[in-house]
């Protein structure tokens, strides 16, 4: 991006200016955090200084950075950023659906958040997404549009902090190859309703309600249950709360066998559900069940 100014983050005057700007935003607007663009290009010592200044302003000030590849712990650690963008799982989300290969995203989730000592980010809070202002919308990326109601339950219940890009709750499309304007359209709810390929607002609202109240989804353990090419299930657990996610990306129905006792409620439909035996899912559907 040659049109953007490149600041010298080794220059003390530049660093002080940036700190003053952040201080001004906190004092004037009481902001709670910052999202740092291309954080992977920033000097690591500057990130440490920024961290110290922001936490001095507010001890719960949130610092999130844009990262793409590599070990995210390089930027996300107690001295630098609180969270980073999880592009590894972003890729795994849409390509697992398109290739009908849920092993890909399951591998990434276990690699990042599993219980083994070698897992990379267990207990950390990465920013999860299926689209944003830099990539094609998920309704464009998915080959089978029927899978749209399945990918958001996965996004909201996998470890991490889920984000929804405006307009995608209506399934609107946008192709990155057509430029930024195609991805960053004017907010027009009526047009979104008319142009979208799937109205996901009810489902996403239910998932948001669960996510904001659920300790299991915010901080719980991640345990895979059943994995096939076109089906995937897992559970999240914390302080007696359990959330079980069942995903069927195939066009045909499938019967899961979670083998989990207790009374559960499907948060999407509001219906009681028994997970102790066989659980039937229609083609391209999902169940998110909670025991509280």
Role assignments for model-derived ranges:
Residues 17-44, 128, 132:
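Active-site groove signature of glycoside hydrolases
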Residues 27, 37-121, 154, 171-206, ...:
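Active-site-proximal helices and loops of the catalytic beta/alpha 8
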């Amino acid at each position: 991006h040659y049109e953007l100014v490149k600041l010298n983050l080794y220059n003390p005057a530049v660093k002080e200016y940036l700190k003053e700007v952040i201080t001004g935003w906190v004092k004037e607007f009481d902001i709670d955090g910052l999202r740092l663009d291309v954080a992977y290009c920033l000097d690591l010592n500057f990130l440490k200084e920024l961290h110290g200044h922001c936490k001095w302003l507010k001890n719960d000030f949130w610092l999130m950075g844009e990262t793409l590849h590599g070990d995210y712990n390089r930027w996300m650690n107690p001295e630098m950023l609180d969270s980073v963008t999880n592009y590894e799982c972003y890729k795994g989300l849409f390509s697992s659906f398109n290739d009908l290969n849920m092993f890909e995203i399951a591998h990434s989730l276990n690699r990042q958040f599993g219980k083994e000592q070698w897992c990379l980010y267990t207990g950390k809070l990465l920013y999860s997404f299926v689209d944003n202002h830099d990539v094609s919308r998920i309704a464009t990326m998915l080959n089978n549009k029927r899978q749209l109601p399945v990918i958001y339950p996965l996004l909201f219940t996998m470890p991490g902090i889920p984000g929804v890009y405006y307009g995608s709750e209506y399934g609107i499309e946008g192709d990155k190859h057509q430029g930024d304007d195609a991805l960053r359209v004017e907010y027009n709810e009526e047009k979104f309703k008319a142009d979208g390929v799937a109205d996901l607002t009810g489902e996403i609202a239910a998932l948001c309600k669960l996510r904001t109240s659920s300790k299991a989804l915010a901080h719980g353990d991640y345990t895979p249950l059943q994995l096939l090419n076109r089906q995937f299930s897992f559970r999240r657990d914390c302080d007696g709360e359990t959330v079980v996610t069942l995903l069927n990306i195939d066009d045909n129905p499938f019967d899961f066998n979670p083998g989990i006792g207790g009374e559960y409620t499907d948060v999407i439909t509001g219906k009681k559900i028994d997970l102790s035996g066989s659980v039937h899912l229609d083609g391209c559907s999902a169940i998110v069940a909670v025991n509280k």
